[in-house]
Amino acid sequence: MPFITFVTLKNITLPEYTTLNMSAPIFAILMALIFLKEKINIYIFLSILSGFLGVLFVVQPGFENFNIYFLLVLFGAFLITITTIILNKYNNTTSTLGFFIYAGLVVHIISWFFFLLDPLKISFNIFLFITIASIFINLAIFLSTYAFQTSQKYYASIFCLVYLQIVWSSIIGIIFFKEYLNFVAYLGAFLIVLSGIFSIPAQKKQLNG
């Protein structure tokens, strides 16, 4: 998935990538119906609809011309969904730490191989930033793994919370980079928060059957 991200971001804009990547919850609902036999309720549909519209309003993508890399992003979102479905379906196979280590082992081995072939010299400051970013991303992956592994009866409604990352990105952009949103984007942020709120009764309804 990181490879797909790097390749696509070289060929499409960030707003287009973000919007297409947010199709993952839609894939999640379809797979939850087929493979997990979950009962999908109206709150889940409202959460998905509100979240996706919110993303469109925030990133405001152009999509002026079709780009073959759009399909690659959708494929990446599909792979993410497959991974989380496996975590949920086979939750008793190993611990969260086990899934985390097994999944990351191959990626890190391949990364070291490419680094040895083409080593990159960087300054200490850049190395420090990369290290901090690595800690944060691995922590995020671990927590996501735990969430999807333990969300036995409400996988689809948990996935709806993915849309909240757009709100956090916007807040960080305002605080650290002085990137302010327009009115439409703020409306989108409200819809994304609303999406997270809809996911709460969605989870309760799934638990109650």
Q: Where are the regions that the model predicts?
A:
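Loop-to-transmembrane-helix transition segments
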Residues: M1-I4, I68-G76, F115, L120-A140
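Helix-helix packing/entry segments at the starts of transmembrane helices
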Residues: T18-S23, Y90-L105, F142-I174
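Hydrophobic transmembrane alpha-helices of multi-pass small-molecule transport proteins
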Residues: Y43-Q60, V184-Q203
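Membrane-interface helix-cap regions at the ends of transmembrane helices
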Residues: F3, L53-E64, V107-L128, I174-K178, ...
